[in-house]
UniProtKB/Swiss-Prot annotation:
InterPro entries listed in its UniProt record: Beta-lactam/transpept-like, Beta-lactam_cat, Beta-lactam_class-A, Beta-lactam_class-A_AS
Protein name: Beta-lactamase PSE-1
Keyword annotations of the record: Antibiotic resistance, Disulfide bond, Hydrolase, Plasmid, Signal
Quaternary data: Monomer.
Family designation: Belongs to the class-A beta-lactamase family.
PANTHER family: BETA-LACTAMASE, BETA-LACTAMASE-TYPE TRANSPEPTIDASE FOLD CONTAINING PROTEIN
Disulfide bonds: C72-C118
Record field: catalytic activity: a beta-lactam + H2O = a substituted beta-amino acid
Pfam families associated with the record: Beta-lactamase2
Gene3D superfamilies named among the record's database cross-references: DD-peptidase/beta-lactamase superfamily (3.40.710.10)
Single Gene Ontology MF annotation: beta-lactamase activity
Biological processes per GO annotation: beta-lactam antibiotic catabolic process; response to antibiotic
PROSITE patterns to which the protein is assigned, alphabetical: BETA_LACTAMASE_A
Amino acid sequence: MKFLLAFSLLIPSVVFASSSKFQQVEQDVKAIEVSLSARIGVSVLDTQNGEYWDYNGNQRFPLTSTFKTIACAKLLYDAEQGKVNPNSTVEIKKADLVTYSPVIEKQVGQAITLDDACFATMTTSDNTAANIILSAVGGPKGVTDFLRQIGDKETRLDRIEPDLNEGKLGDLRDTTTPKAIASTLNKFLFGSALSEMNQKKLESWMVNNQVTGNLLRSVLPAGWNIADRSGAGGFGARSITAVVWSEHQAPIIVSIYLAQTQASMAERNDAIVKIGHSIFDVYTSQSR
C-alpha cells in the first residue's frame, strides 16, 4: 500500500503503448472472442508513464457490479464535502432486500452505517448494501453527475440493483467503456477526485475483496498486489476492474469487460484469467 500511495501524484499524460508490446495480448483476446462468440473490451493504463493500450476500449459494456466502486467513491467525496456522514445509520428493512445480499440479509431489523454498507458491497458485492449507498448519494443520477464532474463523459448509471445488470445489447443504460472506467479509477486512486485518506479507504475496500479469488488474483505474479471489483449480468456480461502493482512495478489499471455471449460463468471467468495472465506477462517479461 505504501508503494501504491507513493505514485498518487504521478499522473502523466496518457500515451499509447506500442502495438508490438501488446501484440500477444491482442491475439489472445481475439482468440477468446472467437471461441466464446463474445464481445470483449480491455484497457490497460500504466500510471508511471501514462502508457495506455486497449482493445475495443471505446465500446460500451454493461457496468454490472463494477459500478460499486464509483458509488462508494461518490459517498467518500460527499463526506469530504460535508453532504453526508459515513457514520450515519440506515435501518435495514426486509422489503428492501434484493437478490444476492449475503451481509445485509442477516441484519434485517438492525441498522448499518453507510461506511459499513460500502465495506459490504465492495468486499462481498452485496446488492442491498449497494442500493443503500445509492440512496445516500442521490441515486443513479447522483452517481452519473459525479462522473461528469470529474471528467468521465461516458460512464452512466441509470438504475439500481438488480435491474442495472440487465445487459441488453444496444441499451446505453448502466454502461461504461473500458477506457473511460480505467481513467476514472486513475482519478479516484491517484488523482484529485478524493483526499489521500479516502484514496486509502477506497483502495482498502478493493484490496479486501472476497469474491474475486478465481479471477485475476489467481494468476497474479508472485510479490504483486491487487485491488479489484468484479461484476456479472445478463446476456453473458462479466467484468473486472483492478489496480495491480509490486515493489518494482508502478500501479497498472486494468479493465476487462465481456458481453453478448452464451458462455457459462466458468468459461467467462476463465477468459478473464487468460486475458489477465497475458497482460501480466507483458510486464513480468520486461524484468526477466
